[in-house]
Amino acid sequence: MDFKYSRELKLESLDALNLTEGIPLRVNENIDLEFRGIERAHSDWERYVGKLNGFHGGRGPQFGFVSACIPECLPERMETVSYANEFAFLHDDMTDAASKDQVNGLNDDLLGGLDFTTEARSSASGKQQMQAKLLLEMLSIDRERTMVTIKAWADFMRGAAGRDHHRGFSSLDEYIPYRCADCGEKFWFGLVTFAMALSIPEQELELVQRLAQNAYLAAGLTNDLYSYEKEQLVAERSGTGQVFNAIAVIMQEHSVSISEAEDICRGRIREYAAKYVRDVADLRAKNELSRDSLAYLETGLYGISGSTAWNLDCPRYQVSTFVDFKTPEDETAKEEFIHVPEQKQFVGDGSIEDQTTEGNQEIVLRKLPQMSTEVIEAPYTYVKSLPSKGVRQRAMHAINTWLQVPMAKMKLIEDVVERIHNSSLMLDDIEDSSPLRREYPAAHMIFGVPQTINSANYELVLALNAAHQLGNPTCLQIFIEELQRLNVGQSYDLYWTHNMITPSMNDYLRMIDSKTGGLFSMLSRLMVACSPRTVSADFDSLSRLVGRFFQIRDDYQNLVSAEYSKQKGFCEDLDEGKYSLPLIHALETCVNSDRDMLRSLLVQRRVAGHLTFEQKKLVLQIMQRCESLEFTKSQLCVLQTRIQEEIDKLVAEFGDENFSLRLLVELLVVG
């Protein structure tokens, strides 16, 4: 690996330990940029989350954690990477003193900012605002590698990040795999590849991550060696009594003292470091890996020496500098699963339980309890349990950063929007004859058309009831107005398809404004009506633009996205005969021969009820000749710019930045 941004540093104390197999210590030349990132993270934490009171993170007396562990971090990325690492240290300290449920709640809070399929737990927290600010900064520098980082970070938050800290381990061998994951292996993979602008080829990824584990284990156990005293103190003060640390595990397994456990731990560190040095040397000699993969693995070498040198004298693990870190109120994580309710056996008289009328001549006069809602809610419960992008819910919580709607009313508004949205999906799938919903059978393919329609209608009644519970007559009026708009919009969508009428682009946009935009309009209007703040800001334009962006993005992805094909079928909109923006553009702009061919294909779809794979490919070829897909993508770019401008206006109106909302829009950009 070429060295452009680092220098070798000799530390006698490091050499005396004999832990790093002679791996030289290299430190990035831009330590000032690292410290600037640390200071900025502290400032933002105090602004968005709370007071730090003497917190110590990545800063050491001579150099910082990032400078020593990623010595070849690009200078223009150092401050951002340092901010990200400090944010991770801050979060880590919160989880150290937390109960198991608190740890899960804290992790789910951050996971919610990374993974749209995770349920949004509350309004965008201060930590989510910091996280969104960081990711927006990273996206502006390098979108491709930031997306890798987001996925890696989400995987880490989902499966590790302290979730096993309360588990007991009977041996070091049992503890080791968990320590490898918990030391931030996945998060660090994303951060290193971003810091150095590395792209690991897909075919090498599994090998690279497997080989790197010895480096992470050496670094993780070194951290255990130096952090044990602090973590023991945290456990005592918090009352958890459980220390997630190799020293504690070794002491219990071998019934030895702290110093003896430390010696055993040092032996394991040397073992992992030596194995890693040999592996990297072999890889260099074979010269079979890509340049970027080898650079990532070589960085692991300097991560071993760098983390050891940093641990030696960093204030973070000195008990004399330790301060308690407060955790927020307990928030229990919610497990998600696909739910298909067990079907009860029905008997001839329509009752669920097998009852007998023998000896009961006056049964018709009995006063009986109301029937259960289990049957009518079964299709809705199924649709609700399917994987969801969850974008509307996240948009609500991001907007609530400004509006500060009380949580009880937010839950009701969420209930209104979710019931209307999912009931609309159930009816849409029937009206469009769609067999799939997010890779799973559509509700009517399981429960039948009549039962699904009845369930969807029932959910609209429950949505009305939730709107009524908001206790504001304005909310009921908003509910009625927007539900009317939504159904009017759907009527035109169905009318055009049934009668094979090509709408103008203006009419198509008006339909979107009523249908897709109507749901965004409903949620923003309900939130404004329930806000304790005096709100003069207008969300109508933002709702309209976001609705158009969502629908047109869906039009585009339906035709080009492999993920959409997996979830809904290849070019499903063409099977349904729906008029999308790309199709309308093609019909308006194609040469006569292509236009006639498109119309003939639409007729064939109506006759057969679908298009063949080959027919769909032909439609796509015509669209490509007409540049309809390029046109659609350009319109998405226009909408994204206008949405950010609308956010700018709202930021000026409220006087507060909204990083969560900006990040939400940025992550939906079509690549």
Curated annotation (Swiss-Prot):
Its EC number is 4.2.3.220, 2.5.1.158. A motif (DDXXD 1) lies at residues 92-96. GO terms for biological process: alcohol biosynthetic process; isoprenoid biosynthetic process; mycotoxin biosynthetic process. Dimethylallyl diphosphate binds at residues 437, 515-516, 551, 558, 568, 578. A motif (DDXXD 2) lies at residues 428-432. SUPFAM superfamilies: Terpenoid synthases. Pfam families: polyprenyl_synt, Terpene_syn_C_2. Keywords: Isoprene biosynthesis, Lyase, Magnesium, Metal-binding, Multifunctional enzyme, Repeat, Transferase. Mg(2+) 4 binds at residues 428, 432. Its cofactor is Mg(2+). In the N-terminal section; belongs to the terpene synthase family. Bifunctional terpene synthase that converts dimethylallyl diphosphate (DMAPP) and isopentenyl diphosphate (IPP) into talaropentaene as a single product. The C-terminal prenyltransferase (PT) domain of MpMS catalyzes formation of hexaprenyl diphosphate (HexPP), whereas the N-terminal terpene cyclase (TC) domain catalyzes the cyclization of HexPP to talaropentaene. This is Talaropentaene synthase.
